[in-house]
Design a protein with these regions (language model features):
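Helix-to-loop junction immediately C-terminal to a conserved catalytic motif
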Residues: 51
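Conserved ABC transporter NBD signature motif
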Residues: 59-67
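ABC ATPase NBD coupling module
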Residues: 68-85, 182-184
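Short coil-to-helix segment of the ABC ATPase nucleotide-binding domain corresponding to the Q-loop/switch region
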Residues: 97-104
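Conserved signature/switch motifs of ABC ATPase nucleotide-binding domains
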Residues: 132-135, 153, 184
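Conserved ABC ATPase signature
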Residues: 133-143
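Catalytic Walker B motif of ABC-type/P-loop ATPase nucleotide-binding domains
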Residues: 158-161
Length: 216
């Protein structure tokens, strides 16, 4: 399988606090990867490094064959904008925009892009609620809009940080199922403390005291 992400000897610390110590990780195109660990274990830090939001102290991070540490500021901005889709625990939907408008931020809602936006909403099961506003949706439905938004520019990589942390059991299961369904369209990395994600993972790792341990 084609390698999309490759980390080698990645170290990250904040002041005297070591967070990640010598992380090695290869992710193939189309894989769904789950990073498990309690709060403070470094899951979010690792996501941010891969997404180009933060920088490592040492080591190498290659995404799409490019070394993130060698990118210019402009190249990093373009990488974050065009190649990475983000999903967070809090949906961050704009309350005055409809489901369609939130899901398609950055697209022009006409012609082929309008057709594509409709396809995305169909994928996440919200095609019949495209003109509703966030306040009219359940928490699970709002997170589905956030997932659709992350897919809108067909990113190579989707990173999700505790995407079901605020949802009840039924909505959490629904969102996990959706991640599995869309994993054919993008490489997905999910950071979570929820062991139920092991069911959908192609590979899973646990962060423990700065080290990455493969558990699936």
């Amino acid at each position: 399988m084609e390698k999309l992400v490759a980390l080698s000897g990645v170290v990250k610390s904040y002041g005297d606090t070591s967070v990640l110590m010598g992380i090695d990780l290869d992710i193939a195109k189309g894989e769904l990867i789950v990073l498990l660990g309690p709060s403070g274990s470094g899951k979010t830090t690792l996501l941010n490094l891969i997404a180009g939001i933060d920088t490592a102290n040492s080591g190498e991070i290659l995404v799409l064959g490019k070394n993130l540490s060698e990118m210019t500021d402009l190249e990093l901005t373009e990488y974050r904008r065009d190649s990475v889709g983000y999903i967070f625990q809090f949906y961050n939907l704009l309350p005055n925009l409809t489901v369609m408008e939130n899901a398609s931020l950055g697209l022009e809602l006409k012609g082929e892009e309008l057709d594509y936006a409709k396809i995305i909403l169909e994928k996440v099961g919200l095609e019949d609620k495209s003109q509703r506003f966030p306040a009219q949706l359940s928490g699970g439905e709002q997170q589905r809009v956030a997932i659709a938004r992350a897919m809108a520019k067909t990113p190579a990589l989707i990173v999700a940080d505790e995407p079901t942390g605020n949802l009840d059991k039924n909505n959490s299961q629904s969102v996990r199922n959706l991640f599995k369904e869309i994993s054919n369209d993008a490489t997905i990395i999910i950071a979570t403390h929820d062991n139920d994600y092991l069911e959908i993972a192609d590979k899973a790792y646990e962060l423990n005291e700065g080290k990455l341990i493969k558990i699936k």
